[in-house]
């Protein structure tokens, strides 16, 4: 009999309910498994366009020199979905949007967008750069949360022609629940590359459409030469569409196809490929 098998442990959230319980769970696991046998995963990192973030950054000479606070005004990360909590009301009551989406999926995308170039594509080297970003996140005081974050909960409504229940009417959800199903807020990274650049995150259920998207908004040009046309120049945008239609678009200003000199925003679009939406 062949006894030279191997063992692997694959874990995804929820990994504990807070730092203390997560550390306790991690210690228990490491008593039974070697570190190289443990795979703590985030399924968002399996999405093609999430993986494409590092390729766009580090395989294209045009982006990396601009990828800093000298040229970028802000970065927006959105993950919205049409679905409600479905049959996960009991789980969602203990997590809410913050634990369900922000502390894992959203922060993983922020880390990929903000990290320094790793010394190699080895998973440990990439992880090391992500950790530096997470350590640079400014800690939020209660007054910061009140000023820079918004939480909400979906109510009854009509989506795609169908009436839908409110969150409090879902199975295994308390009638007076205050669990947020929507979170939007501003994160700040205190390092030389990103000082002063806000990272806006937003995620929610029962939204108008399913969208996972990154928008990089660049700063204005030093001077608007077209001020005599009463035209405010639109910001240059790099838009990374992760789902449902995977692709990259670059929004620039160009001359209108009319006599005289006036500008209009144009969009350079590249569809990487189109796939069916997945959870």
Stretches found by the model and what they are:
Residues 1-11, 15-271, 275, 279:
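Secretory/organelle targeting and membrane-embedding segments
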């Amino acid at each position: 009999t062949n006894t030279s098998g191997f063992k692997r442990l694959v874990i995804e959230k929820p990994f504990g309910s807070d730092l203390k319980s997560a550390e306790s769970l991690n210690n228990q696991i490491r008593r039974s498994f070697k570190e190289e046998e443990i795979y703590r995963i985030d399924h968002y990192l399996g999405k093609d366009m999430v993986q494409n973030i590092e390729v766009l950054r580090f395989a294209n000479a045009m982006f990396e020199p601009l990828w800093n606070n000298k040229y970028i005004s802000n970065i927006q990360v959105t993950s919205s979905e049409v679905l409600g909590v479905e049959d996960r009301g009991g789980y969602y009551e203990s997590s809410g949007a913050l634990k369900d989406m922000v502390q894992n999926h959203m922060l993983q995308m922020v880390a990929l967008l903000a990290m320094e170039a790793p010394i190699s594509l080895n998973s440990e080297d990439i992880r090391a750069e992500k950790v530096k970003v997470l350590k640079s996140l400014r800690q939020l005081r209660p007054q910061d949360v009140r000023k820079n974050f918004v939480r909400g909960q979906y109510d009854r409504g009509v989506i795609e022609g169908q009436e839908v229940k409110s969150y409090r009417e879902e199975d295994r959800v308390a009638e007076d629940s205050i669990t947020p199903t929507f979170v939007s807020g501003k994160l700040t990274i205190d390092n030389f590359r990103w000082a002063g650049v806000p990272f806006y995150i937003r995620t929610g259920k029962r939204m108008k459409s399913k969208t996972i998207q990154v928008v990089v908004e660049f700063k204005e040009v030093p001077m608007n030469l077209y001020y005599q046309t009463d035209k405010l120049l639109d910001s240059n945008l790099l838009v990374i569409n992760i789902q449902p239609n995977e692709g990259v678009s670059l929004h620039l200003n160009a001359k209108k196809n009319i006599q005289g000199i006036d500008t209009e925003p144009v969009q350079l679009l590249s569809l990487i490929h189109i796939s069916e939406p997945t959870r």
